């Protein structure tokens, strides 16, 4: 097993499998993902490109000694039997329209084995449950199935990756309380301009000895410093779903952060990574490398990420000052369990029950204060 390093790249970089920036040629993305030159941890999910991202990463890994890289995989969306629902993507494998609990173990084993086959490796260093629904967070059957693939050597450690949108705070904490003895990793959204709600689950991660991977560290590409007011986004770019004015507001806050970065000889992206890593349970950051039209090359961004110091340079007062500048509390409607959900549960949103209300009390979270959209979205 090779433990994930402090910086990593995911197969969603380069715009081929998720719509961020210009899609790069497959050969270029393979070169970007090939371990070496300061980056040896790679993340993938089997649903990206319905397995194509796995296959491309497998080509990037060809000929590299297995001991020289760490692979974090993710399973959860059933693209084998499930039908894609437009922008919502493929259903979770726990969707009752696809199968019941008696078939969860078979699916988890199949999905894990096929992903490994596409990658050309024997085992994941970390295997994440990808974007679970309420069942995924709470079902002993699901986690027994994950335990089985770990115990059989198909994965060295397990974790949970909420998403795709922001939220799921109480669900992640509840999952750690239920299955903490199985869970070594969690992946959450966190960056200096989005400290909320990700920071709310970090104390529980620390308590349960769970290491955290943070994604969206680049804040939609802004910390790469080539997204400015008037930026030309492609018609299908995911960032078009962000609130109007997010670029302008973000750039204003970025400029307030720049002196802190310069004080330590860091780029804005390296500052964002350092800020995340300064939170005790955070062990790995995985920003998205985006090829902006007319912007810096993703190869240049990779080199910048690789040069991020592992040693934490920021002091506590700087971490707090950065948080205050980027404070986004209440700026968006969150996914997962929330006090403002009405009606039946959906795959990515549901109401609070007594157990989750008790979880909130234990961790000092007031749902009406901490998990509601309170202000107009800033992006």
Walk through the language-model features, giving the residues of each:
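N-terminal binding-site loop/beta-alpha segment at the start of enzyme catalytic domains
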Residues: 1-73, 77-79, 363, 367-379
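Acidic (Asp/Glu)-rich catalytic clusters
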Residues: 1-4, 58-70, 116-120, 144-151, ...
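Short, well-ordered coil/turn segments that N-cap beta-strands
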Residues: 2-7, 38-41, 65-69, 121-125, ...
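Conserved, mostly hydrophobic/aromatic
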Residues: 9, 42, 57, 71, ...
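Active-site beta-loop-alpha junctions enriched in small/polar residues
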Residues: 12-14, 47, 74-78, 129-134, ...
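Short, flexible, mixed-charge acidic loops at enzyme active sites
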Residues: 22-23, 82-91, 226-233
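Structured C-terminal cap/extension of enzyme domains
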Residues: 36, 40, 203-379
